[in-house]
Amino acid sequence: MIDETLLEAEEKMERAIEHAKEEFGAIRTGRANAAMFSKIVIDYYGSPTPLPQMASIGVPEPRMVIIKPYDTSQTNAMEKAIRDSDLGVNPNNEGNQLRILLPQMTEERRREMIKVARHKGEEAKVAVRNVRRKAKEELDRLVKAGEVGEDDGRRAEKELDDLTQRFVGTVDELIKHKEAELLEV
């Protein structure tokens, strides 16, 4: 019972970390990457579809992105969605593809993005701690019901705390890495 609870908690914490990595990937740095377009959704014949499912996204240069739609009739819709997004970029429509030159980020914008990264990191830490809280409640319930001994319960709680600290440390590393990436000129 204890092993199952700890295993489930670890899986949920790993999912929280994966979600945080996705969120960090969508934060724009001074460098181009395909993940920054993952949150952009286009209305494709009535159904909202993420941009990466509708086009190939290439990064030929550090500050340039080329988006080649699979269906060229959607190029204008993609251009509008990118322009309306919070990325602050202006795509050039070349008919069969979109070319996006990323402007150099200002110091103010970098600081703003660092705040966003820290906020996303705190959200990930809260998610990890919530998983810990739920797992601890389950462990307490098992001890109270007499399904496991108190010593085993305390040992499992210590393992849970170690697990939580490890994942919170991982989030801290992700934040540090993203900050360094954002401060790089």
Swiss-Prot record:
Q: Which GO terms describe its cellular component?
A: cytoplasm
Give the similarity note: Belongs to the RRF family.
Q: Which GO terms describe its molecular function?
A: ribosomal large subunit binding
Tell me the gene name: frr
Entry-linked HAMAP family: RRF
Q: Show the Gene3D superfamilies listed in the entry.
A: 3.30.1360.40, Ribosome-recycling factor
Protein role = Responsible for the release of ribosomes from messenger RNA at the termination of protein biosynthesis. May increase the efficiency of translation by recycling ribosomes from one round of translation to another.
Q: What is the superkingdom listed in this entry's lineage?
A: Bacteria
Q: Which classification does the entry list for the species?
A: Bacteria, Bacillati, Actinomycetota, Actinomycetes, Micromonosporales
Task: Tell me the organism.
Answer: Salinispora tropica (strain ATCC BAA-916 / DSM 44818 / JCM 13857 / NBRC 105044 / CNB-440)
Instruction: Give UniProt keywords alphabetically.
Output: Cytoplasm, Protein biosynthesis
Any idea where this protein resides? Cytoplasm
**Nuclease keyword on record:** no
Q: What name does UniProt use for this protein?
A: Ribosome-recycling factor
**Pfam family for this entry, one:** RRF
Q: Does the keyword field hold Protein biosynthesis?
A: yes
Gene Ontology BP annotations: translational termination
